[in-house]
Amino acid sequence: MLKIRQLCVTSLLLVSGVASAANVRLQVEGLSGELEKNVRAQLSTIQSDEVTPDRRFRARVDDAIREGLKALGYYQPTIEFDLRPPPKKGRQVLIAKVTPGVPVLIGGTDVVLRGGARTDKDYLKLLDTRPAIGTVLNQGDYENFKKSLTSIALRKGYFDSEF
């Protein structure tokens, strides 16, 4: 009898969680352009049936927003949540108000070429494409630059390269 009661309570909790998830819509404010696009891409990993007004969901949204901004050089955003009542015939709206903060700027790059790599045309050409001083750090561009260095090293037999 006790097991049946526990099963009923558990089922009720699961059903009520799904019902509340269906009644909440997530809205992000304060971003535009590439920042908004990248944050939306991070948030797209969250299924619509997982959207709830609880703190655990807010923490997940907070993490996704931070990851989306970090990739584009914004490491200290401010994120505030506001749960608004539903419009006339709608769902509750969980609003994430985002202020991206100050971006990380590239202060310098230090690429040291040794041996034959110092005069290698492919390396010298690649160095012209490195992230410029004073520009906003873009994690994707930085990783692509590193991959290009590694690719040239492997292709030309420079096996002592390191980062």
PLM regions and their residue ranges:
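Bacterial N-terminal signal peptides that target proteins for export
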Residues: 1-11
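Hydrophobic h-region of N-terminal signal peptides that target proteins for export
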Residues: 12-21
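Interaction-mediating elements
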Residues: 21-163
